């Protein structure tokens, strides 16, 4: 009986530690300034200027899913994220967006972030790559 209590207590402790270790970045902007990038046949706008802490939100207005890829970004560069985490809450560099849905990132410090959006197309090749840039801070 005592052994069962020990196992239960250990399991609860492990689950608590796992939940604490998997905490991720906040899902909203601290500055409350949100900048939308619409994903259509092209990005609108393809270059966006924001301040540190602002939220950049990609909006998929296409009829099929797309994915936003930010290969040079790490969690150290971010103050918030939504849609760029795996099932354990860890950041990943690809955010998948269903039609009429969004993903978002908030950048901590001045930087120039080049990203791309991959979208299915009826044109030859099957995938269209739409390049974009986020300029954080500065002017």
Q: Across the structure, where does each feature detected by a protein language model lie?
A:
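Bacterial N-terminal signal peptides that target proteins for export
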Residues: 1-10
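A mature extracytoplasmic/lumenal domain signature
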Residues: 41, 60-64, 70-74, 109-111, ...
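Beta-strand cores of secreted/periplasmic/IMS beta-sandwich domains, seen most often
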Residues: 46-69, 102-109
């Amino acid at each position: 009986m005592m052994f069962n209590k020990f196992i239960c207590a250990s399991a609860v402790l492990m689950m608590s530690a796992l939940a604490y270790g998997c905490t991720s970045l906040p899902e909203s902007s601290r500055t409350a300034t949100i900048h939308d990038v619409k994903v259509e046949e092209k990005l609108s706008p393809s270059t966006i200027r924001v301040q540190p802490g602002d939220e950049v939100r990609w909006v998929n207005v296409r009829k099929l899913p797309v994915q936003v890829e930010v290969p040079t970004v790490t969690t150290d560069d971010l103050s918030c994220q939504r849609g760029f985490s795996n099932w354990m809450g860890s950041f990943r560099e690809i955010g998948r967006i269903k039609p009429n849905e969004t993903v978002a990132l908030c950048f901590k410090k001045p930087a120039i972030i080049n990203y791309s959006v991959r979208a299915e197309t009826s044109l030859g090749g099957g995938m269209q790559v739409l390049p974009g840039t986020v300029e954080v801070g500065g002017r």
